[in-house]
Swiss-Prot record:
This is Putative 4-hydroxy-4-methyl-2-oxoglutarate aldolase. NCBIfam families: NOT-MenG, PRK09372.1, PRK12487.1. It comes from Pseudomonas fluorescens (strain SBW25). PANTHER family: 4-HYDROXY-4-METHYL-2-OXOGLUTARATE ALDOLASE 3-RELATED, REGULATOR OF RIBONUCLEASE ACTIVITY A. CDD domains: RraA_family.
Amino acid sequence: MNHYVTPDLCDAYPDLVQVLEPMFSNFGGRDSFGGEIVTLKCFEDNSLVKEQADQPGAGKVLVVDGGGSLRRALLGDMIAEKAAKNGWEGLVIYGCIRDVDVIAQTDLGVQALASHPMKTDKRGIGDLNVVVTFAGVTFRPGEYIYADNNGVIVSPSPLKMPE
């Protein structure tokens, strides 16, 4: 597991990175995470989040455009534990999560807007690996994302921590 410091990455790569608007909180067991972006667009339905958590995710971060909904949780403890088991570096969710006490103990990076106790409906609706935009940034599958307690940044190419 790599450790990232987003202010240091911003200082080292000012012309490469885009910084997300500061609306996310760190809920995961990892205080920093980063990797290749896999995108998902869904609204109050986490069926595809669960499907992706079942896939191998080494070196990858699932970026979920949940439309900013504050009415349902797109991630809970069971899906988070499955994602960690399958090697995902983390998730950045433009929406809510639940089971925050368990997720805080899970070896997974999780950034989201807030917690909400209500689960989603399961309709199987959503789009995988599409370009999504939220928090002032456009996310493209195959680009890179880095997150810590300072914020979340995106780069078109992988970044290395400065010496």
